[in-house]
């Protein structure tokens, strides 16, 4: 089995960026997804330009910050995106507004000069029932993989792909992670593990309720213990280039 450790939130804060780079250079992270239009975006781009082996995708924003378009249907009274707590309860989103905003973020990302590796989203917003089909079509248009939604799986990738958010919060630990991967090994060819490594900074503490835990993630993702365990169990670390958004491709 192969495993993709994808680090979310690239571009959120400098501490997040530095943690992701540390997890890439000294650990098992080979892929990340960047949030455009966020405070540490320029810093993230500068770092990415010096890391050719780090595959960078787009971390679509629909629950954080302000939109790039004038999609009034997507925001609250303050002009920011609908807060996370309210986002999932709404069922009145305009699919055209969703499409326009997502495309704007993709095009913004490409204009930064980065190669688009794949697409996912902050708080898994693209799995909202009104967002899912729209974002799926956009991923197909740009011919890049989309983090598992139920619409994209073996039929698209040509292999048994599985996404897991197990490595998060109270479940962050070496033993827990390895045991979880072993339960998946016989059933899947490629498993994506969501992760959030970071070096804690004041900006992160101010904008995220998930802050201190990120340093524990970083410690595990860069540990010799994890690298040895993966080799012991014949689990190969890979990146999102393993998944090609086209039928009949074998990623085994």
UniProtKB/Swiss-Prot annotation:
Originating organism: Vibrio vulnificus (strain YJ016)
Bilayer-spanning residue ranges: none
GO MF annotations, alphabetized: deacetylase activity; hydrolase activity, acting on carbon-nitrogen (but not peptide) bonds, in linear amides; metal ion binding
NCBIfam families reported in the protein's UniProt record: PRK02134.1 (NF002559)
Protein task: Probably catalyzes the deacetylation of acetylated carbohydrates an important step in the degradation of oligosaccharides.
Homology family: Belongs to the YdjC deacetylase family.
Enzyme Commission number, as recorded: 3.5.1.-
Classification via SUPFAM superfamilies: Glycoside hydrolase/deacetylase
Top EC class for this record: hydrolase
Protein known as: Carbohydrate deacetylase
């Amino acid at each position: 089995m192969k495993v993709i450790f994808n680090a979310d939130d690239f571009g959120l804060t400098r501490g997040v960026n530095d943690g992701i780079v540390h997890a890439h250079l000294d650990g098992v992270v080979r892929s990340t997804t960047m949030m455009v239009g966020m405070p540490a975006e320029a810093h993230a781009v500068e770092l990415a330009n010096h890391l050719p082996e780090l595959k960078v995708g787009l971390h679509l924003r629909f629950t954080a910050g302000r939109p790039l378009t004038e999609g009034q249907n997507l925001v609250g009274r303050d002009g920011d995106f609908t807060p996370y707590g309210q986002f999932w309860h709404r069922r009145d989103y305009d699919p055209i507004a969703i499409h326009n905003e997502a495309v704007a973020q993709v095009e913004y990302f490409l204009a930064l000069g980065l190669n688009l590796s794949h697409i996912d989203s902050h708080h898994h917003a693209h799995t909202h029932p009104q967002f899912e089909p729209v974002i799926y079509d956009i991923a197909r248009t740009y011919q890049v993989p989309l983090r598992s939604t139920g619409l994209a799986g073996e039929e698209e990738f040509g292999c048994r792909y599985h996404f897991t958010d197990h490595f998060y919060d109270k479940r962050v630990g070496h033993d827990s992670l390895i045991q979880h991967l072993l339960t998946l090994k016989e059933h899947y060819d490629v498993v994506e593990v969501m992760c959030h490594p970071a070096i804690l900074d004041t900006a992160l503490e101010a904008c995220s309720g998930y802050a201190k835990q990120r340093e524990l993630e970083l410690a595990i993702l860069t540990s010799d213990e994890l690298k040895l365990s993966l080799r012991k169990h014949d689990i190969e670390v890979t990146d999102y280039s393993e998944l090609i958004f086209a039928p009949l491709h074998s990623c085994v």
